[in-house]
């Protein structure tokens, strides 16, 4: 194979520099040119990938440097990137600042570490008023930065002079975007603002302006070489998917509506690889669970914004409460399973009543960040002492967080117990990522097989 394909990462010195907006503009520009784009986001963020998908019309893939850290899961990050790189161009949006990774551990698990693992060069998005800080910033660590796109450039800026300064750093200025108060997307905070219809107008305007300044010839020099090893594209070879398991189709009810929308595209793919038929349903709008299902999955989302609608759908609450199939619930789904849960202003609403206690709003993030989880006993997803990597990000807490597993932050600064796991339930605040942790689904299938044989 070993052919070259156009690919680059978009990064910045810090969050709020216009990375997402300019990434969306680039996606839109290439779409207008008739190019197909494979889109990625480093880190665990659900929201920016939603923006990518809105503009591109195709799924965006999370390349998480902690879940798939090479020292912990050798080869997984590279395998994921190339397996999903089926289009003309790959664009990776880096999370936060280029060197922002595990706190106190340098650039570990940063966007920079992803670019180095994949041998992908980086284009920095730099606000004009931050430009003078770029040179010093790039001295911090080794990197693959090759070019700059300037953001919020004033009408009277001397572009030729700026270009010379960029060249003196050993970089190229390949485009710029003039300042415009209309070029703004509300802060997403890893899940506080989903893309609205107005995003299309904003991105089209950005694309119009940016396309007039982009050096398309220079962009063609950003590429990655495909690997010789064709097995990198074949998950069955790597993960030993049991073909006998694939022949046994299980129907999995997957909550997906306004209240529950946070899931990784790779999770759906892994479930399908292991023989699950995904049946999407709405806890808000549907009256009962889908027919003939073997598993219920309640993903993360915004149940607090739809507390009244969820709690007033009594037939759905009863349908979930009375089911005896395995239930997996992450963060928002976990909140929904409580006896009671609060909306965003503290009003209390009835939940499914499978988790005894109350989920309640706090004034700050609770136990947030990357974590490594170790199981204390066997459950529907994990065996004793098995470990997975995960993350938590929530302003809610619970009177019943669970004690099934023990979580330790990535930098080992804090630790706590988490997850309720008994009989057929696996529910807690941690978000689950299945790629590289396929044993979770192998365990689930084994559980279903045992139950079927009883």
Regions found by a protein language model. Give the residues of each.
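C-terminal and late-domain segments of enzyme folds
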Residues: 53, 245-247, 260-270, 277-279, ...
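Structural motif
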Residues: 9, 91-93, 123-125, 149, ...
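Phosphate-binding active sites in nucleotide-utilizing proteins
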Residues: 240-322
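Internal gly/pro-rich beta-alpha loop/helix module
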Residues: 129-240
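Acyltransferase
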Residues: 192-248, 256-260, 421-454
């Amino acid at each position: 194979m070993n052919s070259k394909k156009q690919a680059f990462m978009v990064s910045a010195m810090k969050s709020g520099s216009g990375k997402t907006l300019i990434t969306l503009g680039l996606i839109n520009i290439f779409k207008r040119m008739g190019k197909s784009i494979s889109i990625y986001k480093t880190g665990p963020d659900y929201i920016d990938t939603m923006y990518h998908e809105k503009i591109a019309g195709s799924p965006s893939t999370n390349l998480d440097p902690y879940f798939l850290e090479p020292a912990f899961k050798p080869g997984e990050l590279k395998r994921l990137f190339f397996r999903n790189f089926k289009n003309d161009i790959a664009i990776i949006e880096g999370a936060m600042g280029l060197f922002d990774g595990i706190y106190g551990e340098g650039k570990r698990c940063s966007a920079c570490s992803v670019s180095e693992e994949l041998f992908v060069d980086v284009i920095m998005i730099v606000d004009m008023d931050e430009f003078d800080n770029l040179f010093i910033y790039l001295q911090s660590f080794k990197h693959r930065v090759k070019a700059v796109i300037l953001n919020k450039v004033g009408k009277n800026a001397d572009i030729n002079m700026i270009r010379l300064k960029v060249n003196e750093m050993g970089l190229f200025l390949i485009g710029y975007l003039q300042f415009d108060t209309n070029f703004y997307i509300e802060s997403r905070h890893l899940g506080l603002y989903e893309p609205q219809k107005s995003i299309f107008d904003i991105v089209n305007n950005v694309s119009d302006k940016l396309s007039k300044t982009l050096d398309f010839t220079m962009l063609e020099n950003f590429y990655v070489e495909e690997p010789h090893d064709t097995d990198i594209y074949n998950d069955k070879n790597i993960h030993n998917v049991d073909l006998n398991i694939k022949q046994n189709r299980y129907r999995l009810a997957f909550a997906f509506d306004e209240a529950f929308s946070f899931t990784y595209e790779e999770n759906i793919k892994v479930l399908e690889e292991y023989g699950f038929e995904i049946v999407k349903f709405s806890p808000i709008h549907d009256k009962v669970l889908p027919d003939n299902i073997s598993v219920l999955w309640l993903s993360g989302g915004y149940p607090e914004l739809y507390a009244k609608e969820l709690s007033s759908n009594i037939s759905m609450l009863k349908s979930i409460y009375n089911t005896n199939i395995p239930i997996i619930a992450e963060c928002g789904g976990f909140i929904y399973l409580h006896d009671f849960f609060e909306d965003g202003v503290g009003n209390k609403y009835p939940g499914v009543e499978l988790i005894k206690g109350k989920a309640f709003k706090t004034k700050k993030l609770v136990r947030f960040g990357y974590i490594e989880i170790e199981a204390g006993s066997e459950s529907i997803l994990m065996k004793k002492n098995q470990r997975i990597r995960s993350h938590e990000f929530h302003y809610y807490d619970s009177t019943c967080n669970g004690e099934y597993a023990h979580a330790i932050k990535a930098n080992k600064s804090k630790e706590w117990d988490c997850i309720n796991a008994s009989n057929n339930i696996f529910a807690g605040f941690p978000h689950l990522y299945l790629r590289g942790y396929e044993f979770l689904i192998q365990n689930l299938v084994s559980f279903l097989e045992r139950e079927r044989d009883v």
